[in-house]
Amino acid sequence: MPLSTVALIFGGKSTEHEISIISAKSIAAVIDPFRFQVLPLYITHEGKWFTGEFAENILQLDLAEMLRSTSLDATGNTLRQMAMHTGQQGFDFDFFKAGIDLAFIALHGSYGEDGRIQGLLDTFGIPYTGCGVLASAVAMDKALTKLCVTEAGIATAPGITILSSEYFADPKSTQKSIEEQFTWPVFVKPASLGSSVGISKVHHIGELIAALETACRYDSKILVEKAMQGREVEVAVLGNNAPEVSITGEIEPGSEFYDYADKYIHNAAKMYIPARISPELQEQVRKDALRAYKALGCRGMSRIDFFVDETSGTIVLNEVNTIPGFTDISMYPRLFAASGLPFNELVEKLLQFALETPSGARS
């Protein structure tokens, strides 16, 4: 029986480019070589597609060490220089349409997790891992996610949405509105980025301008939310029509909140599996995660994050990640490993779920 060809798509134009490469490297290492032939497909920061030797060489890089020893900018510049000096030509889309049986999407953030690559694959009729166009797009937008899960009866942090154009047209009015509606601290975040990129915790009015301008550099829509008390608790969900829910996990940030540097550079955060909350709260978090997954129309996989206040028993949904990280420190594979599903079997199941769903038949 001939092997099925899996396009492992990684890199991309988002600020999470480097993390995508680390995820793809982990995934490639465990795909069953007796069932699947892996075709690495690397997308540069500028959006140029490569396969073959150059893509394979990118997968061999120790990006995790590069991020720790240099910086995000320096690592990105190294990758750009490699792309500029490769003699290889760009990707042949005719081959893509004819030679791929399914795709494992290992892209994170914009242009990968937001429905765009999913729409392209649907157009070509290629099955792929994870959520479809609509669920991906809605979950990527934190403001839209809040609307959807609130309708399903799931609590979210009090917040408002601000367009960057509104802020720049009248900064003082925006600041005044925020000050009148919230007590400090608040979080200011781009509506559609992951890995905590562009997020600031604001403790007083003097920090607000810098936080708003930082968020506006990354997105045209900004979310301002009340900072919630409690533990950061995460749940992994896997499946299509009958999703499985992992046990809970907890993040204890190494800094004031779980930001990009804490996640991928300093590695200072502590993880607890299961989360240090009561069994009753753990079960309720798992139920809320499944409700959110279904409300958004998710398929394949998602990691769903909450704030849990044990004193009050309050559970608040923070965000839904439709393509969670697959790095050595990523919570999604760790949660399923702790639930009895090893990493290689997790990847195998994701490929099976992709093949179960005809392209274009998912939300």
UniProtKB/Swiss-Prot annotation:
Protein name in the entry: D-alanine--D-alanine ligase
Binding residues for ATP: 179-234
Keyword Disulfide bond on entry: no
Biological processes, Gene Ontology terms: cell wall organization; peptidoglycan biosynthetic process; regulation of cell shape
Purpose: Cell wall formation.
Catalyzed reactions per annotation: 2 D-alanine + ATP = D-alanyl-D-alanine + ADP + phosphate + H(+)
Cellular compartment(s): Cytoplasm
Signal peptide: none
Cofactor note: Binds 2 magnesium or manganese ions per subunit.
Binding site for Mg(2+) 2: E319, N321
Any Gene Ontology CC annotation: cytosol
Domain spans labelled ATP-grasp: 146-352
Source species of the chain: Chlorobium phaeobacteroides (strain DSM 266 / SMG 266 / 2430)
Keywords linked to the UniProt accession: ATP-binding, Cell shape, Cell wall biogenesis/degradation, Cytoplasm, Ligase, Magnesium, Manganese, Metal-binding, Nucleotide-binding, Peptidoglycan synthesis
Record SUPFAM superfamilies: Glutathione synthetase ATP-binding domain-like, PreATP-grasp domain
Positions of Mg(2+) 1 binding: D305, E319
Gene name of the record: ddl
EC annotation from Swiss-Prot or TrEMBL: 6.3.2.4
Family: Belongs to the D-alanine--D-alanine ligase family.
